[in-house]
Amino acid sequence: VNKRAFESLIKSGALDVLHKNGQNARSELLKLLPKAVEFAEQIELNEAQNSLFEEDVTQEVIFNQVENVKVWESRKKLLAEKESLGFFLSGHLFDLVDDETKKISSLSLKNISPKPEPYWIRGIISSKRKQITRRGSVNIVEIDDGKAKVEVNVFNEAFEKFSDKLKIDEFVMILAKVESDDYTGGQ
């Protein structure tokens, strides 16, 4: 197993159980990794096999060498999970803003339905793309609240005006009119 594989395992949370601080250990484990790899390479050079006792001592020595490591904030931890796994494992980015934004709209994306009047939808941008149609181009932003995903068509003028705010993995709140999509059967 190489260093890059260990980085992915740490970022995904797969090694949380190996540390006394659980999920709070990811930053410490990542900081520790170069020393651990160097130490393992040195051991490999010195001897062909280690006893179980020596491995425990090695782990303890390495952990004692790590000092002043800041615990990752929830957002950083979730983004590291997504980077290594392709999805959020221990939660969702939307959970970090859900309570705070319920004052404006408590509507979950799974409960939206076509209505003549617009209403506020909120979530995390999971993807965005430009699609060419017979009528021209349309900008599509996919919003995810951890329970459902919806695609929002954004007019070119609005997309260009707010393009600096429409970033992947960022929270967005959009006043939108929900219509049925006869082509895909969705909304």
Region locations from a protein language model:
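Sliding clamp-binding short linear motifs
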Residues: 1-114, 177-179
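Single-stranded nucleic-acid-binding OB-fold domains
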Residues: 19, 92-187
